[in-house]
UniProtKB/Swiss-Prot annotation:
Its cofactor is Mg(2+); Mn(2+). It catalyses: 2 D-alanine + ATP = D-alanyl-D-alanine + ADP + phosphate + H(+). HAMAP family: Dala_Dala_lig. GO terms for molecular function: ATP binding; D-alanine-D-alanine ligase activity; metal ion binding. Mg(2+) 1 binds at D257, E270. This is D-alanine--D-alanine ligase B. Its EC number is 6.3.2.4.
Length: 306
């Protein structure tokens, strides 16, 4: 008898709509591959009952908090249900941009200079030291919530007087916010599937940066796979991504986002342990370049579940 698979989709995070689309695509791909799969939305269904509902494995197609942050992974482990993607610790670290950066920096990997602020510090008023640290980053900067995905709450700041509004927006989404030196790009993303590093993708948004609209709504964002890098650059990028991935303890499948700055140096942006799987998504694009159909991709991700 084949395993009965729960595809978790939707959920309650800011990325619910994206997750519903990802989950629907994953479900169709698994079924096409002969897998006995069913959609389960944690917003509608008590996921603590998955085992009693007869499920033997879980494909996590949730994005953001409550699905990608280690909490769900811990629950599934306590229930003894194998699931796709990274474990508890790696999921929690990867969704947290600040702690990812601290670990990468500690491992000697390149990250953009940044200043981290808490909501309490912001509400109290920034100290002269903090203001000096922010000023030292120069302009423009990018302001982002530490634990939000899909560029939610993120904004580019080109003038000093716009910083407060950008921080206010970011603090609507998290208790910790990063102010990062702006990197000129281009942006690349590299997908990982088991032990395999898939071909890199170069991203060219039509707007200021690769924001929510560029990721999920715009048809003007351009993607290049292969990315057009020289063989030595591609090898360097893949080696960097593998180090970043293993430093966080990630496994299964996912994506690392990287920026190439004007100095010719790659800088790590963030890790995604449950990336989008929509029509605009990048892991399926990289898999296609590697000769893998969408159905083959999702079946392979499921095979890696433990």
């Amino acid at each position: 008898m084949t395993d009965k698979i729960a595809v978790l989709l939707g959920g309650t995070s800011a990325e619910r709509e994206v997750s519903l689309n990802s989950g629907a695509a994953v479900l169709a791909g698994l079924r096409e591959g002969g897998i006995d799969a069913y959609p389960v939305d944690p917003k509608e269904v008590d996921v603590t009952q998955l085992k009693s509902m007869g499920f033997q494995k879980v494909f996590i197609a949730l994005h953001g908090r409550g699905g990608e942050d280690g909490t769900l992974q811990g629950m599934l482990e306590l229930m003894g249900l194998p699931y796709t993607g990274s474990g508890v610790m790696a999921s929690a670290l990867s969704i947290d941009k600040l702690r990812s950066k601290l670990l990468w920096q500690g491992a000697g990997l390149p990250v953009a200079p940044w200043v981290a602020l808490t909501r309490a510090e912001f509400e109290k008023g920034l100290s002269d030291k903090q203001l000096a640290e922010i000023s030292a980053l120069g302009l423009p900067v990018i302001v982002k919530p530490s634990r939000e995905g899909s560029s939610v709450g993120m904004s580019k700041v080109v003038a000093e007087n716009a910083l407060q509004d950008a921080l206010r927006l970011a603090f609507q989404h998290d208790e910790e916010v990063l102010i990062e030196k702006w990197l000129s790009g281009p942006e690349f993303t590299v997908a990982i599937l088991g032990e395999e590093i898939l071909p890199s993708i170069r991203i060219q948004p039509s707007g200021t940066f690769y924001d929510y609209e560029a990721k999920y709504l715009s048809d003007e964002t351009q993607y290049f796979c292969p990315a057009g890098l020289e063989a030595s650059q591609e090898a360097n990028l893949q080696a960097l991504v593998l180090k970043a991935w293993t430093t966080l303890g990630c496994k299964g499948w996912g994506r690392i986002d990287v920026m190439l700055d004007s100095d010719g140096q790659f800088y790590l942006l963030e890790a995604n342990t449950s990336p989008g799987m929509t029509s605009h998504s990048l892991v399926p694009m990289a898999a296609r370049q590697a000769g893998m159909s969408f159905s083959q991709l999702v079946v392979r991700i499921l095979e890696l579940a433990d």
